[in-house]
Amino acid sequence: MTKAIRVRYAPSPTGLLHIGNARTALFNYLYARHYGGTFIIRIEDTDRKRHVEDGERSQLENLRWLGIDWDESPETHENYRQSERLDMYQKYVNELLDKGLAYKSYVTEEELAAERERQEAAGETPRYINEYLGMSEEEKAAYIAEREAAGIIPTVRLAVNETGVYKWTDIVKGEIEFEGGNIGGDWVIQKKDGYPTYNFAVVIDDHLMEISHVIRGDDHIANTPKQLMVYEALGWEAPEFGHMTLIINSETGKKLSKRDTNTLQFIEDYRKKGYLPEAVFNFIALLGWNPGGEHEIFSRQELIELFDEKRLSKSPAAFDQKKLDWMNNEYIKNADFDTIFALAKPYLEEAGRLTDKAEKLVELYKPQMKSVDEIVPLTDLFFADFPELTDAEREVMAGETVPTVLTAFKEKLEAMSDADFVTENIFPQIKAVQKETGIKGKNLFMPIRIAVSGEMHGPELPDTIYLLGREKSIQHIENMLNQIQ
């Protein structure tokens, strides 16, 4: 590429970092790093009604947690928040007004709503009808004077070229074209409060920041022709555009919605649950992009090297929670113990389970964790009440040799001293029961496991018995014998 690559992620500080926005940031980051370009963070805070206190800090903090870094941002550069650039926007509003390419509009919200209602009732596509249509210059001046005398504050609208055609070659979707007559009429570029609208401000920002490529979600496709109109009106060259497909819920096939409370959708949620940032980064990178091949686990550097915008998918990206859980489990299994133990400690401490056996518990359950917060329910066996048996477990415990196995193993545990009661000495006791009773395989191990833990599956049986403790293991076996005899 001969053009200097400059891309941006431009969030509105209206809440937490959604996984869709995180994907936008991540793909722009990969694009910049792959081509040796510049990645910029710009804060689009012109929608004051939706502004959330601390929203900007939350966005940046969660991006950092993911491992996304940037070259330019409000932290290092002046006027990288739209609210700091109002004079700049005003300059270009004035330029368009002076050229006759924009005009002040005094139509009220009530009048717009009434006209929209009339159009819908008539089966027409709602659009703005120029309020000055058919007026002479004298009538226009009188209309403006009357409106201003009534205290009506105008907006500024861009005069749309209804016969114009606005097209671009999309990086993801190929050729896209809109006719000027289908945009909805002249549209507002400056609101009554003096703030620019999104589609105007973003053009000024992207041009002045020399953005070369705009990579964003395909919900912005309808915004692009309006932005191209502003580029045209100001005589500027537009950047290249790429619109990523929407993210759908793999279970419902519907667009991932923030209202879907059954799906974790905010990066903050994954942080709190103990997902590893490397796993979440890896997972998001594969939402709508495929490097080819069957391999799915990639380091950040591998993703940077492999990234190719030509492999961005035209089909919706499926958000599969089970796949993310699998991927996170792979990262947890391969992470060093100290990292996982440090992450697990706060969960254990909050649950009152940070005992002298905590390290052994984390070591035992590390391979099973889909998220680090699962260390608490996984260790219920050692701290909570004995669980109610399932029908399958009851069926096992109804076997005729079960009392023999449990009685023999209980006697072995009772004969062990506290000093002898260590993990490596427990398995030989089980083998001794096998030798004495002639009972082996599942008929030997399964009754002991269920009697001790209340579960058919779990960590290695000697580890489970050791962590439960000799006295508690004996007590559980006695309780089970009382139930089945």
From Swiss-Prot:
It catalyses: tRNA(Glu) + L-glutamate + ATP = L-glutamyl-tRNA(Glu) + AMP + diphosphate. GO terms for molecular function: ATP binding; glutamate-tRNA ligase activity; tRNA binding; zinc ion binding. A motif ('HIGH' region) lies at residues 11-21. InterPro entries: aa-tRNA-synth_I_cd-bd, aa-tRNA-synth_I_codon-bd_sub2, aa-tRNA-synth_I_CS, aa_tRNA-synth_I_cd-bd_sf, Glu-tRNA-ligase_bac/mito, Glu/Gln-tRNA-synth, Glu/Gln-tRNA-synth_Ib_cat-dom, GluQ/Sye. Gene3D superfamilies: 1.10.10.350, HUPs. Its main location: cytoplasm. It holds the Pfam family tRNA-synt_1c. One of its GO terms (biological process) is glutamyl-tRNA aminoacylation. Catalyzes the attachment of glutamate to tRNA(Glu) in a two-step reaction: glutamate is first activated by ATP to form Glu-AMP and then transferred to the acceptor end of tRNA(Glu). PANTHER family: GLUTAMATE--TRNA LIGASE (PTHR43311), GLUTAMATE--TRNA LIGASE, MITOCHONDRIAL-RELATED (PTHR43311:SF2). This is Glutamate--tRNA ligase. It comes from Streptococcus sanguinis (strain SK36).
